[in-house]
Swiss-Prot record:
Residues 136-139 are annotated as: G4. Its EC number is 3.6.5.3. It catalyses: GTP + H2O = GDP + phosphate + H(+). Mg(2+) binds at residue 26. Residues 174-176 are annotated as: G5. This is Elongation factor Tu. It holds the Pfam family GTP_EFTU_D2. It is found in: Cytoplasm. Its main location: cytoplasm. It comes from Lactiplantibacillus plantarum (strain ATCC BAA-793 / NCIMB 8826 / WCFS1). Residues 10-204 form the tr-type G domain. Residues 19-26 are annotated as: G1.
Length: 395
């Protein structure tokens, strides 16, 4: 019999479970797959298989992450769950698993704990704007008023980090009971997924965002002009489009795309994910360099000063062996090039140890085409020592 063809009929959303260790993130993930599998919408995955997450490498950093997929009536989901706290930190900062929204799991027996706070802060910093709360283990708390108190604490904590704490949906239940087949708790899981369907919006697809292509290579074709090549990061581009060449200089160069090629064939339209060469009108070979970006006019500017949320590799991961202090000057690899920058640590942080995550301010020696959400690596002599994301533009 012929294999079924995978039809992408439903909108796709990336989510993940976040929260303190042992509050039930993986149990909830397993319960979601089990309950949806009974409706024919998922393949059931047990706790052990999710917990034994495979190692991945993203930008030179080893991360353990479990990827689970399932569907609801309305959507297709890719769900990430990470076994260790450090894996979450690395995942969120490197964007190895881009989340459109998250389910924050809080045990009603414990209430918010240090990692609950840290994951909420990370979600805020890296741009996960939508959170649904699952108050887990409510079956182990005899007094409903205690659960009300925990809910209030979680809402206050979310508000503290500029999430709409009063409006965020909070679902109460027991992931373990649902996993064990308790019909009431299975209903709770279905209700949770209905809420996730409703509350977490479908993301804007990369192709619908403004065009951006980091320049990897530049060459000239005699008699035709200058070609900039690279992988389109977002948006689309077609022959005749006006573009700006942004980065490394204060001034922005304007041009028009007069030709597009992919795999040595001409192309009418390039879109996010394509590796293309763009022929640029009226631009000299010397005016475009690797590390700049081609972008839709007005969509991105250059900046020198920004705040970054950064994970610093441990010695075992091939990172530094010693701490660093303010005025440390490594290279910041944005898009396709290294730019030296000076780090200023926040008040009260004297030094940063290998294996830490930290928010610090950077002043680059050359302007880069960056915005909130731009990913970067921190490098020293060509070695990756950290990975980060721009959390705020400061100049």
């Amino acid at each position: 019999m012929a294999k079924e063809h995978y039809e992408r009929t439903k909108p796709h959303v990336n989510i993940g479970t976040i929260g303190h260790v042992d509050h039930g993130k993986t149990t909830l993930t397993a319960a979601i797959t089990k309950v949806l599998a009974s409706k024919g919408l998922a393949k059931e995955q047990d706790f052990a298989s999710i917990d034994a997450a495979p190692e991945e490498r993203e930008r030179g950093i080893t991360i353990n992450t479990a990827h689970v997929e399932y569907e609801t009536e309305k959507r297709h989901y890719a769900h990430i769950d990470a076994p260790g706290h450090a894996d979450y930190v690395k995942n969120m900062i490197t964007g190895a698993a881009q989340m459109d929204g998250a389910i924050l799991v809080v045990a009603a027996t414990d209430g918010p704990m240090p990692q609950t706070r840290e994951h909420i802060l990370l979600a805020r910093q890296v741009g996960v704007d939508y959170i649904v709360v699952f108050l887990n283990k409510t079956d182990l708390v005899d007094d409903d008023e205690l659960v009300d108190l925990v809910e209030m604490e979680v809402r206050e904590l979310l508000s503290e980090y500029d999430f709409p704490g009063d409006d965020i949906p909070v679902i109460r239940g027991s992931a373990l009971k649902a996993l064990e087949g308790d019909p009431e708790q299975e209903k709770v899981i279905m209700h949770l997924m209905d809420v996730v369907d409703e509350y977490i919006p479908t993301p804007v697809r990369d192709t619908e965002k403004p065009f951006l292509m980091p320049v990897e290579d530049v060459f000239s074709i005699t008699g035709r002009g200058t070609v900039a090549s690279g992988r389109i990061d977002r948006g689309t581009v077609k022959v005749g489009d006006e573009v700006e060449i942004v980065g490394l200089h204060e001034d922005v160069l304007k041009s028009t795309v007069t030709g597009l090629e992919m795999f040595r064939k001409t192309l009418d339209l390039g879109e996010a994910g394509d590796n293309v060469g763009a022929l640029l009108r009226g631009v000299n070979r010397e005016q475009v360099v690797r590390g700049q970006v081609l972008a839709k006019p007005g969509s991105i500017q250059t900046h020198k000063k920004f705040k970054g949320e950064v994970y610093i590799l441990s010695k075992e991961e091939g990172g530094r062996h010693t701490p660093f202090f303010s005025n440390y000057r490594p290279q910041f690899y944005f898009h396709t090039t290294d730019i030296t920058g000076v780090i200023e640590l926040p008040d009260g942080v004297e030094m940063v140890m290998p294996g830490d995550n930290v928010t610090f301010t950077v002043e680059l020696i050359q302007p880069a085409a960056i915005e909130k959400g731009t990913k970067f690596t921190v490098r020293e002599g060509g070695h990756t020592v950290g990975a980060g994301v721009v959390s705020e533009i400061d100049d």
